[in-house]
């Protein structure tokens, strides 16, 4: 989520620190509260070991998606059909399935709209009057019961049904006439859907008007499986705007049909470049794949040129695939400048850093450096923690402050210099938390925002010889504020935090704690070994806070 939120709350934080630092309060330190034997509320289990590793019987369900979608750039309407292949690897038969319908946040009668304060919020649609939310059409199921896993699967029988379902706010419950088998039961869920995009979609998606056309940044745009796990069973907390996401991993095949004058970028790799790019653009992309410097794929002077788009059809379908992902987002516009460079990964593999942005953002102190920032960020985290897994890392200018998705991020078209570096680096840091290490953001915001803010501090120190290196802070001055008992605990779910406190409690305070642990308690070597082991253990899995704490204690 946006680093702008962190910066704004940090400014308030400094003001508060100035006030509280004038007096020295008596320490409230209590050894028994901090280190008592009751810290861990349960012992290790078959699915999660006491040492912080996934247990010998750890299981996780999966969800693959095939989605065909079209964009009407005049009405801002998205129309699609999807097939979700859901595999139940749990030891439980499932009598029903839960689906997330995040666009329903923008219905007039949604729970999220009901709790937006009268003085405004970054959540919701900022008062836009429109017909928001999903329209759900046909829903059907095809499922195959495989039963318990064996070395050789027996022949399975497929059954097609039209299920009963009910929609409550941002959730959809599909009732199964026949339970989905445990330990490998598979079902295909087919859903037709459409929605009208908000202009401002809770600072996570939306539509930006530019002089050369609209930029459509599409996220939370398709019905998505809820997670069924060994902690809570079905995770069905509603989407209210502040709490982010918890999703299953899988493979996504996405076909996006748009007007031919649009360029499209999406999570993953493009499968049909010859059908959607000109010969010149294909050649420029080949050059970029070999270049450590930014190469222009489509320049500012080509944005309105018919020669910069294929001429054969009125509409084009762009086909993308991403594997080992928990989500997918995309962007489409006729207004894009497009540039790229290669990313060098520790294994010797290559990926592509790409940026798309309007002419309004095209200057050397702004988005002309976006690909440079993207490349540096991905290369740093890949070298320091674990290798970037996707074929491209794409930065898109939009009307979002900053928002992250697998392989693609949306950042403010107004950002420049240090601000653009900061938001770009922050959003791409989220590839590691929570895109690779898939924690439950809706419950534990600090496990992605706090961890990410921490690794951002190291990448910023390293970038370009310290070009934007932050000054060292006096933690003694901050201590009174960090233990302010008028603020909620860090572990409070984000939907239950005061909005003004989210930046401190989810971002800064956990980051400060990790920095102190690394710099002053464990030391860099011991901390880095344990933190890297946590990433390796829980890549593409669903860790809880206890899994993190146990790993850090056992490894360090």
Features from the language model and the residues they span:
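Bacterial Sec-dependent N-terminal signal peptides
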Residues: 1-25
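Hydrophobic alpha-helical and helix-loop surface patches within well-folded domains
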Residues: 21, 30-43, 48, 320, ...
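N-terminal, polar/Ser/Thr-rich
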Residues: 21-79
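A surface-exposed beta-strand-loop module
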Residues: 26-27, 68, 77, 87, ...
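Ligand-binding face of N-terminal immunoglobulin V-set domains in extracellular IgSF glycoproteins
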Residues: 76-105, 109-112
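Short, hydrophobic/aromatic-enriched beta-strand segments in well-ordered soluble domains
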Residues: 82-84, 88, 101-103, 185-199, ...
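Glycine/proline-rich low-complexity spacer/linker segments in large multi-domain proteins
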Residues: 109-127, 194-252, 273
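Hydrophobic helix-coil surface modules that form long, contiguous segments used
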Residues: 220-234, 240-425, 454
């Amino acid at each position: 989520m946006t680093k702008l939120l962190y910066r704004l709350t940090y400014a308030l934080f400094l003001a508060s620190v100035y006030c509280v630092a004038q007096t020295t309060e008596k320490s409230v330190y209590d050894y028994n509260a901090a280190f008592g034997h009751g810290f861990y509320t349960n012992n290790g289990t078959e699915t999660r070991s006491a040492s912080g590793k996934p247990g010998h019987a750890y299981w996780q369900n999966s969800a693959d998606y095939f989605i065909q979608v079209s964009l009407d750039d005049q009405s801002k309407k998205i129309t699609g059909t999807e097939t979700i292949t859901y595999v139940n690897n749990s030891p439980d038969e499932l009598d029903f399935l839960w689906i997330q319908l995040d666009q329903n946040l923008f219905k007039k009668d949604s729970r999220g709209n009901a709790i937006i304060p009268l003085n405004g919020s970054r959540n919701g649609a900022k008062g836009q009057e429109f017909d928001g939310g999903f329209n759900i059409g046909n829903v059907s199921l095809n499922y195959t019961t495989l039963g318990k896993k064996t070395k050789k699967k027996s022949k399975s029988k497929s059954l097609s049904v039209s299920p009963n379902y009910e929609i409550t706010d941002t959730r959809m419950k599909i009732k199964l006439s026949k339970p989905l088998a445990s330990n490998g039961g598979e079902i295909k869920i087919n859903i037709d859907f459409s929605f009208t995009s908000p202009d401002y979609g809770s600072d996570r998606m939306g539509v930006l008007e530019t002089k050369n056309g609209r930029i459509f940044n599409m996220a939370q745009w398709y019905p998505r499986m809820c997670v069924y796990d060994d902690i809570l069973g079905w995770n069905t907390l509603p989407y209210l705007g502040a709490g982010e996401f918890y999703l299953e991993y899988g493979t996504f095949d996405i076909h996006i049909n748009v007007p031919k004058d649009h360029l499209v970028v999406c999570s993953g790799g493009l499968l049909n470049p010859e059908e959607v790019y000109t010969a010149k653009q294909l050649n420029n992309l080949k050059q970029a794949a070999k270049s450590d410097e930014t190469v222009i794929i489509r320049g500012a002077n080509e944005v309105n040129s018919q020669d910069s788009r294929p001429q054969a059809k009125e509409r084009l379908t762009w086909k993308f695939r991403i594997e080992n992902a928990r989500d997918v987002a995309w962007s489409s516009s006729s207004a894009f400048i497009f540039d790229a460079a290669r990313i060098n990964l520790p294994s010797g593999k290559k990926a592509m850093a790409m940026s798309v942005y309007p002419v309004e953002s095209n200057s050397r102190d702004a988005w002309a450096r976006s690909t440079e920032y993207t490349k540096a960020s991905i290369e740093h985290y890949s070298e320091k923690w674990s290798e970037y897994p996707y074929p491209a890392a794409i930065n898109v200018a939009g009307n979002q402050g900053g928002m992250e998705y697998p392989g693609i991020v949306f950042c403010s078209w107004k950002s420049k210099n240090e601000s653009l570096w900061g938001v770009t680096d922050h959003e791409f840091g989220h590839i590691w938390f929570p895109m690779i290490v898939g924690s439950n953001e809706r419950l534990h915001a600090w496990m992605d925002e706090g961890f990410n803010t921490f690794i951002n501090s190291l990448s910023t120190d390293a970038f370009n010889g310290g070009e934007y290196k932050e000054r060292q802070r006096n933690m003694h001055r901050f201590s009174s504020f960090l233990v302010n008992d008028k603020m909620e605990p860090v572990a409070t779910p984000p939907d239950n935090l005061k909005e003004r406190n989210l930046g401190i409690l989810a971002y800064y305070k956990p980051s400060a704690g990790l920095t102190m642990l690394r710099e002053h308690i464990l030391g860099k070597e011991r901390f880095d070994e344990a933190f890297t082991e946590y990433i390796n253990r829980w890549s593409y899995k669903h860790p809880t806070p206890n899994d993190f704490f146990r790993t850090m204690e056992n490894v360090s």
